[in-house]
Amino acid sequence: VKETGVKYHVCHISTKESVALIRKARAEGLDVTCETAPHYLTMNDSMLQEDGRFKMNPPIRSEEDREALIAGILDGTIGMIATDHAPHSAEEKSRGLEKSLMGVVGLETAFPILYTKLVKTGVLSLEKLIELMHTNPRNRFCVGTPLEEGQPASLTVYDLDKEYTINPDDFLSMGRATPFAGEKVFGACRLTMYHGSIAWKDETL
């Protein structure tokens, strides 16, 4: 990066060493950004089970690593959170922790898990979470459009007061493998819009 001046983005950081390296690079003025994922921010390796839904790449790390990621979020070293959404069939994830394919789903769980475990516990503000999941990625990669009057909206509506239990059978993704199955969370998705059209809505409302 120093030699070429290239913009550099690191995906799925999960260790304290990665946080330290990126913090150092940014302090030196290098155009380096990074993201991590909900499972690295809310889980540690003591929570692993002999089940394919706990297998992803990078793997779940130690509590020390998790705490370093939180610190990186708070001091701005980590500017984005991504879902790391990797859907696999039930068969591909049924071979146990060692033999199942890498990857878990994240689209349906990312916001409610982070809102419940980081915002409602006071670690992050809701505004900071939106910045990490939406504003910063949009600005870094020049994708999407701002929400402005007269422009076609792309947005998601959540009921922040709605508590529910994560049930993979309710997912719309091909994949059902999530380490968060059975977790009670707040933040139920009620509506999604893409370029001004309703892509999905909760028909129970």
PLM-predicted stretches and their roles:
Residues K55-D65, L101-V105, T178-V185:
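A short acidic, glycine-rich active-site loop
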Residues V19, T42, S89-E91, T156, ...:
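Glycine/Thr-rich phosphate-binding loops of Rossmann-like dinucleotide-binding domains
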Residues Y8, E35, D84, L114, ...:
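Residue-level signal for inorganic ion chemistry
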Residues V1-I81:
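Histidine/acidic residue-rich metal-binding segments in metalloenzymes
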Residues K99, E149-T204:
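C-terminal cap of metal-dependent C-N hydrolases
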Residues K2-G5, L74-I81, A86-Y158:
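His/Asp/Glu-enriched, well-ordered alpha-helical/loop segment
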